[in-house]
């Protein structure tokens, strides 16, 4: 894993963008796809550095997933990004049939998840995405705590062959994880105590 890490407040989408560039530098099979949100999903630098490995599908989230599934069948590792309200929101059927049931190595990236969407408003608030994706067979769901964990999650996803959903947020948040021990499916203890246990996603 690269030595680059986040120490100042940053959005998890920033960690995704940095992590995607890092894994693409190491693995030529990594490709990026976006549904007309390249800047918002922090894929602009990836597009500039790897123009032959970036596909802009436009406002077509169902096609985003279909193209990603085809690339996975061809041996690529596609990271397909849009706002969570649109993917999985608008593309759940394609995710269900083409990715989850087929157990394809597709990484679905949902940005602006949750209620803090800034000026984008209530129509862009993805509140059901975790439930939608957790109900699918073979699908792994990852919700990083901060930008550094999001960066590490991208490395873990690139090395994992299962379909996965990476849920990202819009606002800048403090960095609370500082070690390189992110593992898919394993919790991290951030602070030891004896009086109470807080389990957060």
Language model regions located:
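A short, charged/proline- and glycine-enriched loop
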Residues: 27-28, 191-196
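Thiamine diphosphate
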Residues: 1-167, 172-173, 181-186
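Glycine-rich phosphate/diphosphate-binding loop of Rossmann-like nucleotide-binding domains
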Residues: 198-201
């Amino acid at each position: 894993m690269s030595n680059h890490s986040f120490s100042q407040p940053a959005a998890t989408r920033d960690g995704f963008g940095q992590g995607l560039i890092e894994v693409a530098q190491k693995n030529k099979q990594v490709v990026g796809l976006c549904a007309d949100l390249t800047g918002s999903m922090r894929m602009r630098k990836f597009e500039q550095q790897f123009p032959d490995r970036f596909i802009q599908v436009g406002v077509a989230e169902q096609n985003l997933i279909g193209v990603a599934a085809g690339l996975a069948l061809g041996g690529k590792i596609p990271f397909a990004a849009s706002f969570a309200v649109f993917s999985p929101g608008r593309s759940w059927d394609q995710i269900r049939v083409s990715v989850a049931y087929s157990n394809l190595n597709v990484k679905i990236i949902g940005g602006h998840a949750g209620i803090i969407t800034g000026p984008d408003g209530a129509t862009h608030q993805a509140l059901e995405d975790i439930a939608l994706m957790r109900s699918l067979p073979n699908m792994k769901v990852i919700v990083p705590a901060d930008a550094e964990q999001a960066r590490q999650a991208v490395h873990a996803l690139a090395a994992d062959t299962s379909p996965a959903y990476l849920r990202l947020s819009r606002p800048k948040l403090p960095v609370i994880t500082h070690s390189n021990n992110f593992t898919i499916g394993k919790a991290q203890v951030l602070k030891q105590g004896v009086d109470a246990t807080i389990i957060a996603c």
